[in-house]
Amino acid sequence: MERNNRNEGTHEEEQCSLSDIIYSFCSENHSELNPLQEIFGVTKNNDHEKHDEEPDEESYRMAKRQRSMEYRMMMEKKRRKEIKDKVDILQGLMPNHCTKPDLASKLENIIEYIKSLKYQVDVMSMAYTTTPVYTPPFYAAAQAPCMSPWGYYTPGVPMMPQQNMTYIPQYPQVYGTVPPNQTQP
């Protein structure tokens, strides 16, 4: 008896799934009956059509969401690759390469190198843009090269102001800064 009860339950489930299968073979617009529907004697049911539309809309949304996720992942991968390539180019410009493979240590070394370059530029610009505190007497009385009988600076006159100076002044702007890899006392 239990066996018959099980068969009856499964028979109803089979009929339900059979009707679902038949509707899945139905034409696109569902206005005419499929030959399989005619054979099994199934009639058109509006409830089934409404049921079919919802999964299609859901599956469309799911497919659209999946495509957008794939696109975002692809763009993120492309962005990461571009960043890695540009960091490698920057690292190639440095005189001593960092052998560490991680991005953070590479960027840290690049930043330290750029800071040291900026410090060197500051020191050099301060040395040539400010007037020296001490000027040797012979330099103040020097003639221009075109006025000299030799056609160039005389041997006693330096080419650059700080060349022959015994005292090089300490500039407060430069003296207060230290290279990035050194600490102040």
From Swiss-Prot:
It comes from the Eukaryota. One of its GO terms (biological process) is regulation of DNA-templated transcription. Gene3D superfamilies: Helix-loop-helix DNA-binding domain (4.10.280.10). GO terms for cellular component: nucleus. Residues 67-117 form the bHLH domain. InterPro entries: bHLH_ALC-like_plant, bHLH_dom, HLH_DNA-bd_sf. It holds the Pfam family HLH. Signal peptide: none annotated. It is found in: Nucleus. The keyword Magnesium does not apply. Keywords: DNA-binding, Nucleus, Transcription, Transcription regulation. CDD domains: bHLH_AtMEE8_like (cd19698). GO terms for molecular function: DNA binding; DNA-binding transcription factor activity; protein dimerization activity. Belongs to the bHLH protein family. This is Transcription factor bHLH109. The lineage of its organism: Eukaryota, Viridiplantae, Streptophyta, Embryophyta, Tracheophyta. The gene is BHLH109.
